[in-house]
Design a protein with these regions (language model features):
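Extreme N-terminal, non-catalytic leader segments
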Residues: 1-24, 32, 36, 41-45
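C-terminal accessory "lid"/substrate-recognition subdomains
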Residues: 7, 151-325
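Conserved lysine of the Walker
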Residues: 27
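Conserved nucleotide-sensing/catalytic segment adjacent to the nucleotide-binding pocket
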Residues: 41-47, 53-101, 113
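Conserved beta-strand scaffold positions in the cores of enzyme catalytic domains, especially
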Residues: 43-45, 134-136, 188, 259
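Conserved nucleotide-binding/hydrolysis micro-motifs of P-loop NTPases
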Residues: 50-53, 121-122, 140-144, 194-196, ...
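ATP-dependent NMP and nucleoside kinases share a basic, alpha-helical "lid"
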Residues: 105-152, 201, 207-211
Length: 325
């Protein structure tokens, strides 16, 4: 049986995944994880930051934040996504974060899967129609603050007090223009501090532990069975790390959803079947999880589950394409 990747190549189609969320919310982490698992040759990605219509100086003069739709070329982005879906290359604008200025354009050609990440990928109906699978990343204020300070100070040359001031300035526009987009997402990824803080080490670096809640729209199409193997003997050993997994049904902005919450760190053996299913489905032997560590944190598991959802969505879209041809 042909793998999903082989079938996508043969179909000649281009599929677009959108990842929405605030600046510093972890969108790129999710995007890189999906790209690594699906394969570098199968996926290309870009940031909506490249579609700013105002540079940093102009935004300051106009007293407008990048989160305001008027500070972005949303129609141009829609034009480009529609062109990419047709297999056409584009001249994509480039935004230089180090200078806060536009830096011309660069050629950008589609791969079989295109990931667009940014503040407003679901803001207009035209954009939503151009995106096949929509993910919204929604960390808590404390997690987002930590990640944004770490990124903007370490990678973009800001001072910590500048980042904190910007976070406060942006909050109203985030609520008005970005947060609202999660009602259109098929998957919402909520990231919070772990509840296992009391058991974390008192000295040395703190483990990268989080609590991740995956809010997923109930799939209409049938999905492939996948097991999470739980070995009770491992759980009862004193060396076993703490973790929790829970699932519930709920309504989310008028949609029926399933909510899976993962916290702590999970042993690699528990995700072996999920990894095997992904490898078989994708037709790849690429590294799925980080084998340097015996345990996978909640974000790593969320990336696996997200990618499994992506493959199921691709299966559905490929099948629908055959039915309509």
């Amino acid at each position: 049986m042909k793998s999903i990747m082989d079938r996508i190549r043969e179909s000649g189609r281009v599929f677009v995944f959108g990842i929405a969320g605030d600046s510093g919310s972890g969108k790129t982490t999710i995007s890189r994880g999906i790209k690594r698992i699906l394969g570098e040759d199968m996926v290309c990605s870009f940031s909506m930051d490249d579609y700013h219509s105002l540079d940093r100086r102009q935004r300051a003069e106009c007293r407008i934040t990048p989160l305001h739709p008027q500070a972005n070329h949303l129609d141009l982005l829609a034009d480009h996504l529609e062109a990419l879906r047709q297999g056409k290359g584009i001249d994509k604008p480039v935004y230089d974060h180090s200078r806060g200025e536009m830096a011309g354009t660069e050629p950008f050609g589609p791969a079989p899967v295109v990931i667009v990440e940014g503040l407003h990928p679901f803001f207009t109906e035209r954009l939503r129609l151009a995106i096949d699978f929509k993910i919204f990343v929604d960390p808590s204020r404390s997690v987002k603050r930590l990640w944004k300070v770490r990124r903007d100070v370490g990678e973009r040359g800001y001072q910590p007090e500048q980042v904190m001031a910007e976070i406060l300035q942006r909050e109203p526009d985030y609520k008005l223009y970005v947060d609202i987009q999660k009602i259109y997402a098929e998957m919402v990824v909520k990231i919070q501090d772990t509840r296992f803080h009391p058991s974390l080490p008192l000295a040395g670096p703190k483990p990268d532990w989080y609590s991740v809640r995956l809010i997923q729209e109930v799939m209409e199409q049938p999905v492939s069975p996948v097991d999470l193997n739980i070995d009770l003997s491992k759980i009862l050993r004193s060396s076993e790390h703490e973790f929790s997994i829970e699932f519930q049904r709920d309504d989310y902005y008028g949609k029926k959803v399933g909510i899976m919450t993962v916290d702590g760190e999970i042993h690699q053996s528990m995700i072996a079947h999920l990894e095997s299913r992904l490898c078989s489905s994708l037709g790849t032997c690429a590294e799925i999880s980080d084998r340097r560590n015996e345990y996978v944190n909640a974000i790593g598991l969320a990336q696996l589950i997200l990618t499994w959802n992506c493959t199921e969505k691709l299966e559905h879209l490929l099948g629908r394409g055959r039915a309509s041809s």
